[in-house]
UniProtKB/Swiss-Prot annotation:
This is Elongation factor P. NCBIfam families: efp (TIGR00038), PRK00529.1 (NF001810). Keywords: Cytoplasm, Elongation factor, Protein biosynthesis. It comes from Lactiplantibacillus plantarum (strain ATCC BAA-793 / NCIMB 8826 / WCFS1) (Lactobacillus plantarum). One of its GO terms (cellular component) is cytoplasm. Pfam families: EFP (PF01132), EFP_N (PF08207), Elong-fact-P_C (PF09285). One of its GO terms (biological process) is peptide biosynthetic process.
């Protein structure tokens, strides 16, 4: 059991039979009445973000979240197969659990899988990945690094904005957090 005094960003708690990650929180002491904690929580099963208020000193269960390093092997219909790099155990994750991450997921990529009592809650990609440009408009003579940008389709199907000098076949380093071009690989 933990108290609201132990709150910190990233902590996972169990409230109302749901697993929540604390996104942000604030201790409030009004001039009249008891103190309370205003928090923004993200449901790890559904991804929904919700504001919740707890009275100061309220106690709740800390959710035992595990993170395992796993390697993405292949897609199997609507599921994706990952292998634990330590035990070589394979698990299938439904595509709807990892919809946002699919655009940067490549075979043999290592990811962090978030588990709660054996249930997969999601995956965390590395902050940057190296991907090849599958298709983009050809550059025009005189394009410079300081110019604008154009859309490019990557090998995984993701579409990002890249500088004019990038051409099909180039390998790029892409930020997976905000889906932006970082540099050439």
């Amino acid at each position: 059991m933990i108290s609201t005094a132990d709150f910190k960003n990233g902590l996972t708690i169990e409230v109302d039979n749901a697993i929540w990650r604390i996104v942000e929180f604030q201790h409030v002491k009004p001039g009249k009445g008891g103190a309370f904690v205003r928090s923004k929580l993200k449901n790890l099963r559904t991804g929904a973000v919700q504001d919740k208020t707890f009275r100061a000193g309220a106690r709740m269960e800390q959710a035992p979240i595990e993170k395992s390093t796993m390697q993405y092997l292949y897609a199997d219909g609507d599921s994706y197969v990952f292998m634990n790099t330590e035990t070589y155990e394979q698990i299938e994750i439904p595509g709807d659990h990892i919809q946002d991450e699919l655009k940067f997921l490549k075979e043999n990529m290592e990811v962090q899988v978030t588990l709660y009592k054996g249930e997969v809650l999601g995956i965390d990609l590395p902050n940057t990945v190296t991907l090849e440009v599958a298709e983009t408009e050809p550059g025009i003579k005189g394009d410079t690094a300081s110019g604008g940008s154009k859309p490019a389709t990557l090998e995984t199907g993701a579409i990002i904005q890249v500088p004019f000098f990038v051409k099909a076949g180039d390998k790029l380093i892409v930020n997976t957090v905000d889906s932006t071009y970082v540099s050439r690989a």
